[in-house]
Amino acid sequence: MPVHDEQEHEVYGGEIPEEEEGEMDTEEYEEHGGEEGAAAGDEELEPGSSSRDLEDMKKRIKEIEEEAGALREMQAKAEKDMGASQDPSGGVSAAEKEEVDSRSIYVGNVDYACTPEEVQQHFQSCGTVNRVTILTDKFGQPKGFAYVEFVEVEAVQNSLILNESELHGRQIKVSAKRTNVPGMRQFRGRGRPFRPMRGFMPGVPFYPPYAYGRVPRFRRPMRYRPY
């Protein structure tokens, strides 16, 4: 009998947790309002998380656009500064450019290793040198000629004396700088000039219709002779 009581006690004690767990699940289920309450809770969580992600994405896109705008401004400023440094005569009128060209000379056959300071020293005796420009290609390599701008107009004639003088062991070519007029080409004088009309045209030689073979005979027409 004592054994039987213990067995019944053990069986009864093992069923208690199952009932308590079921009661707790039921209470939690009722507190959330059943299936509708659980679904409503999920719907309240999902829109909140997605809206936060959307706000973060918009904020990041705005930051990227601001960075791109700042980069474009820096690039435009750098290109503007570079263009101004490469073209010192930018924004100058045609009259001012012509006046500057009247005080400038062209120097050809310049050694590639020659520096602007050496060119300035070479023409220092002709007058006050204002600027020396050695032209380069897109790779930064010298093209072999330069322009020298003086302060005085008379220095141009004085510099022509140094034509075919030696600089870095090479004979340089010195000439006055010409002003390039847009849309016009200067005639270089090479070849024969164009003649719009010719005063004399030779006659066309006559060739017989039968150049080869037997020449046909042409008979006189027969006249009527009654006697």
Curated annotation (Swiss-Prot):
Domain RRM: 103-179
GO terms (BP aspect): mRNA processing
Signal peptide (residue range): none
Principal cellular location given in the protein's record: nucleus
Region called Disordered, residue ranges: 1-99
InterPro entries linked to this entry: Nucleotide-bd_a/b_plait_sf, RBD_domain_sf, RRM_dom
Compositionally biased spans, kind Basic and acidic residues: 1-12
GO MF annotation: an example: RNA binding
Pfam families recorded: RRM_1
Compositional bias (Acidic residues): 16-30
Coiled-coil region list: 48-83
GO cellular component: cytoplasm; nuclear speck
SUPFAM superfamilies assigned to the protein according to its UniProt record, in alphabetical order: RNA-binding domain, RBD
Renumbered ranges of motif Nuclear localization signal: 176-183
Name of protein: Polyadenylate-binding protein 1
Gene assigned in the entry: PABN1
